[in-house]
């Protein structure tokens, strides 16, 4: 994330923010000269270009120091680029439902509060450690994993999100066209790889191989989150034992294992009438 310094002289009058502080509205701010617009376009500074008319009008009215004008304009460009990068990475990650920590109900989860807080720091991602979340359906496993994934993107890292079925399909397509190594490399460019809902459907040889390939390639290099209704030690009941043993060995070597309990939160919402918008 970009950190913006705020040092200034006592005589510098500065805005509270860099985007909505102008005493001159954007409708009356003068347009930039065509020559300057062309230069900014050539320099690929679209966010600075968009912000410049209002910023310059405000700077003129409030008599900003020139260095402050430059700082604000550059900050707008950085902010715009960071926002665009996050949008691009969210789209590329393939996150399922837009569930973040804003909608996460910490007190409804059986994950200990201290564990939730510790995982939300993302320090474990920096250490290339893994996370296995296991428990009954509807106990918040996917929501918590997706909230972590969004936060990873927010702090400037990348995410690859799969179900075991979609991962198997991706590796299967790569096997057909001979691009398995390239596909694995693309997946493991992400600092966090999430494989969701392992165990919901039977997994055969192809699924076991795909899972193993990714875990092996990421081992001690990237963080993996898996969610499952099974503890990872039981993965040999849904996929070939040899592959499951080798995969789980690598997965759990540097892993936090979190167990969820209780009844389905989705079912509780449904029975309480909170799963839909009232019709009247």
Model-identified regions with their sequence ranges:
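Charged, compositionally biased N-terminal leader segments and the immediate start
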Residues: 1-47
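Conserved hydrophobic/aromatic pocket- or pore-lining residues that grip, position, or stack substrates
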Residues: 104, 145, 163
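Walker A/P-loop nucleotide-binding motif
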Residues: 128-144
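Active-site signature of alpha/beta-hydrolase-fold catalytic machinery across serine-
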Residues: 147, 151
């Amino acid at each position: 994330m970009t950190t913006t310094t705020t040092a200034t002289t006592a005589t510098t009058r500065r805005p509270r923010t860099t985007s909505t502080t102008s005493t001159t509205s954007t409708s009356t701010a003068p347009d930039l000269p065509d020559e300057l617009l062309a230069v900014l376009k050539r320099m690929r500074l679209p966010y600075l270009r968009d912000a410049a008319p209002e910023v310059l009008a405000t700077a003129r009215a409030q008599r900003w120091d020139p260095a402050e004008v430059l700082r604000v304009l550059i900050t707008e460009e950085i902010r715009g680029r960071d926002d665009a990068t996050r949008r691009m990475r969210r789209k590329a990650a393939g996150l399922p439902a837009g569930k973040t920590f804003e909608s996460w109900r910490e007190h409804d989860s059986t994950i200990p509060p201290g564990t939730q807080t510790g995982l939300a720091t993302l320090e474990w991602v920096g250490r290339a450690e893994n996370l296995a979340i296991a428990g009954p359906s509807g106990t918040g496993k996917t929501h918590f994993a997706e909230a972590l994934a969004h936060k990873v993107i927010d702090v400037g890292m990348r995410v690859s999100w799969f179900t075991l079925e979609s991962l198997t399909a991706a590796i299967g397509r790569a096997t057909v066209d001979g691009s398995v190594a390239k596909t694995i490399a693309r997946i493991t460019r992400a600092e966090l790889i999430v494989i969701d809902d392992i165990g919901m459907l039977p997994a055969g040889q192809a699924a076991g191989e795909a899972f193993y390939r990714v875990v092996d390639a990421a081992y001690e290099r990237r963080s993996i989150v898996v969610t499952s209704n099974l503890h990872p030690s039981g993965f040999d009941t849904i996929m070939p034992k040899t592959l499951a043993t080798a995969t789980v060995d690598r997965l759990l070597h540097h892993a936090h294992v979190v167990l969820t309990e209780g009844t389905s939160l989705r079912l509780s919402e449904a029975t309480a009438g909170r799963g839909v918008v009232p019709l009247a």
